[in-house]
């Protein structure tokens, strides 16, 4: 009788391990859609927190099938019109008599203007650590690489699996926030 009871307990434990995490499946489906897309477009509002000061700006973004992101700064008016491209190998800015002067974050690992590119790169290839419900949204936590000094990104997606908000954390501290609007995968 003890053996049967032990066997039943083991079966219950093993049955619990076989359950599927639907939120992880949704996160992986979003990744697959991004990897298979020819392009993606979205608007971002970015807030960079330096502790003693905060910078905010808005960008229109378009990515290609390789994850390269072209952008145009739309707000504030003082830097509107600056364009650029960010890729794995680096980036370029184009402007007339205006310069983006944002100090680097995360021990010189991250420029705030690269936040949209990092959002897509992380969704496409980062180390997915968790996914679960957060109110009406799903929260996905992803590290940008498998190293100890990885940036962590918490991304909230709506019911249609479109990113709507993200936080970039460095050593557990929120350094950048991103609001995402009009996210479209083509």
Mark where each language-model region is:
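Short, solvent-exposed coil/turn segments at beta-strand boundaries
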Residues: 36-39, 61-69, 85-90, 134-135, ...
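Gly/Pro-enriched, hydrophobic low-complexity segments
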Residues: 131-186
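N-terminal leader/targeting segments and the immediate start of mature chains
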Residues: 16-63, 186
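Well-ordered beta-strand positions in beta-sheet-rich domains
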Residues: 56-60, 81-83, 152-154, 177-179
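Solvent-exposed loop/turn segments connecting transmembrane beta-strands
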Residues: 50-54, 76-80, 147, 173-175
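Flexible, processing/modification-adjacent segments and terminal tails
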Residues: 35, 44-47, 93-146
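Sec-dependent bacterial lipoprotein signal peptides
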Residues: 1-15
């Amino acid at each position: 009788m003890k053996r049967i009871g032990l066997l039943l307990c083991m079966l219950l434990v093993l049955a619990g391990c076989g359950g599927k995490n639907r939120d992880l499946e949704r996160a992986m489906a979003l990744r697959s859609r991004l990897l298979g897309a020819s392009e993606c477009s979205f608007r971002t509002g970015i807030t960079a927190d330096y502790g003693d000061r905060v910078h905010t700006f808005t960008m229109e973004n378009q990515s290609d099938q390789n994850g390269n992101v072209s952008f145009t700064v739309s707000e504030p008016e003082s830097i509107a019109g600056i364009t650029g491209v960010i890729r794995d190998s680096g980036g370029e800015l184009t402007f007339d008599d205006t310069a983006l002067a944002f100090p680097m974050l995360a021990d010189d690992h991250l420029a705030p203007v690269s936040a949209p590119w990092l959002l897509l790169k992380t969704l496409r290839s980062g180390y997915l650590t968790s996914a679960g419900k957060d109110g009406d949204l799903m929260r996905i936590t992803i590290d940008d690489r498998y190293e100890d000094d990885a940036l962590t990104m918490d991304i909230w997606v709506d019911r249609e699996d479109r990113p709507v908000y993200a936080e970039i954390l460095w050593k557990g501290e929120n350094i950048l926030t991103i609001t995402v609007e009009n996210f479209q995968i083509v």
